[in-house]
Amino acid sequence: MLKPLGDRVVLKIEEKEQTVGGFVLAGSAQEKTKTAQVVATGQGVRTLNGDLVAPSVKTGDRVLVEAHAGLDVKDGDEKYIIVGEVNILAIIEE
């Protein structure tokens, strides 16, 4: 399993029509964003005075992420993307 560092997040992209709260996203919005599930998160980032700021997302969250963000990786037969937390636009609450 992949364990990201810092504020990076491992995502599994959902390959289906994107909906948010039951609403289907417009075609142009689907081209700019992807729906994904958080598989793993880094520990967070440290501030200048050394405090650790934990990620805002957790394993299992469904999120909306920028379509062209991140790095495509494989772990065995599974495909994932690794993104910085800054590229996650929203948590999808159901």
UniProtKB/Swiss-Prot annotation:
This is Co-chaperonin GroES. NCBIfam families: PRK00364.1-4. It comes from the Bacteria. One of its GO terms (biological process) is chaperone cofactor-dependent protein refolding. HAMAP family: CH10 (MF_00580). It comes from Streptococcus pneumoniae (strain 70585). Belongs to the GroES chaperonin family. Heptamer of 7 subunits arranged in a ring. Interacts with the chaperonin GroEL. GO terms for cellular component: cytoplasm. The lineage of its organism: Bacteria, Bacillati, Bacillota, Bacilli, Lactobacillales. Keywords: Chaperone, Cytoplasm. Its main location: cytoplasm. The keyword Chaperone applies.
